[in-house]
């Protein structure tokens, strides 16, 4: 498998939502579940589906999951989730994003060194996919009606030391800039046409779900953390 691929373990509602969103963005996926009915259903839509017990270290090792860009663990059973994540860590996979059933489960996963532990009620599958594509440091809040509150660092050098009036991000992306976090602590608000973007700035903006990828690609055209879809 290519380095840009993703693996999803657990084909419940959350796992399948993430799978569909990643597929829409032209990523190659491997889907895993220990339920034959779920894998049979998923195989009707996806090319690479495996019926496998993720808590079985030997079975996971055969899939070479350490070669994937990231593995999303979406199982709901806490014990199974912990065992799967432990197996993935042992196999050398560092980029693990796991669904947490509650705050206790969340803390346990983070104690294990899991890169991201997410409670689905706080972040929906589509928002997770945006973060997978553009970098997990991107923060997404769904305001409803497909309107997103997006907080992300700016890495486009062409924007540095230029004013918002000169750049006119809204014209290029239809996003409305709200504030800028500078030096990790100083907040620039309100923003005006003479406000400059500087290296290291983190911008908060409001935009539509349909335009969020365009906006994030504009402020981070060569983001080293952004995964690229398979050719």
Swiss-Prot record:
Tell me the ranges covered by the RCK C-terminal domain, including all copies. 134-221
GO terms under biological process: potassium ion transport
Query: What InterPro entries does this protein map onto?
Result: NAD(P)-bd_dom_sf, RCK_C, RCK_C_sf, RCK_N, Trk_Ktr_HKT_K-transport
GO MF annotations in UniProt: monoatomic cation transmembrane transporter activity
A single Pfam family, by name?
A: TrkA_C
Domain of life, source organism: Bacteria
For the RCK N-terminal domain, which residue ranges apply? 3-119
Fetch the PANTHER family from UniProt. Answer: KTR SYSTEM POTASSIUM UPTAKE PROTEIN C, POTASSIUM CHANNEL PROTEIN 2-RELATED-RELATED
This chain belongs to the protein called Uncharacterized protein MG323 homolog
What organism is this sequence from?
Answer: Mycoplasma pneumoniae (strain ATCC 29342 / M129 / Subtype 1)
